Design a protein with these regions (language model features):
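Short acidic, glycine/tyrosine-flanked loop/strand segments centered on an H-E-D-like triad
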Residues: 112-131
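A short acidic/glycine-rich loop-to-helix N-cap element
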Residues: 126-147
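Long, compositionally biased interface segments
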Residues: 145-155
Length: 155
C-alpha cells in the first residue's frame, strides 16, 4: 500500500508482494496482529523453515529459526528488538515493519492495519545483493507466495 512504510523500498526491489486479509483482531495493535498471524503458522511452514535452515547451513547462510517468536505475546517490543526471525524497524499502532539483512539480501516485511476496512496487509520487499542471494530466491520466491496466504488464512 502507498501509505505503508515499506512502499519507499519498492524502487529497485528484486521481489515484492502484498497480501490482504480480514483483520481478525480489529482492536489490536499491529504488533499484536503480527504475533497472532505468526503464532498460528501452519505446521508445514515450520517444517519448510526447518528444511530451509538445514540446507542453507551447508552453503554458509544463517539459520533463521522459525517465524514465531520464542517470547510470548505479552512482551513489550521496541525498535531494534528481534521478533522471531526479524529485527523490528518501525512500530506504531497501525504498522509494524521488520527486516532481516545480510550481505546476500535484505528482506523487509510489514503488517499494516487498514482499520476503516477492517483488513490487514502483509507486504514483503526483497533487495538481492549478489549471485548467492539470487540463487537463494529461486526456490524461496514461489514458496513465499504459498506461505504468506496460508498464514493469513489461519489468523
Amino acid at each position: 500500500p502507498l501509505h505503508s512504510q515499506v512502499h519507499a523500498r519498492l524502487r529497485g526491489a528484486d521481489f515484492h508482494d502484498a497480501y490482504e486479509a480480514d483483520d481478525a483482531l480489529p482492536q489490536a495493535s499491529a504488533m499484536d496482529s503480527w504475533l497472532a498471524v505468526v503464532g498460528r503458522t501452519p505446521g508445514w511452514v515450520d517444517r519448510a523453515m526447518d528444511l530451509r535452515n538445514a540446507i542453507v547451513a551447508r552453503i554458509g547462510l544463517k539459520d533463521l529459526g522459525r517465524l514465531k517468536p520464542a517470547q510470548g505475546g505479552d512482551r513489550a517490543y521496541a525498535v531494534g528488538d528481534r521478533v522471531g526471525i526479524f529485527s523490528l524497524q518501525h512500530l506504531s499502532e497501525d504498522e509494524v515493519v521488520m527486516t532481516d539483512a545480510d550481505r546476500h539480501l535484505d528482506v523487509w516485511v510489514s503488517l499494516l492495519k487498514l482499520r476503516a476496512e477492517r483488513k490487514i496487509v502483509v507486504s514483503t520487499v526483497v533487495h538481492v545483493h549478489n549471485a548467492l542471494g539470487r540463487l537463494y530466491m529461486l526456490p524461496v520466491a514461489p514458496v513465499h507466495r504459498l506461505i504468506v496466504p496460508a498464514m493469513l488464512a489461519t489468523s
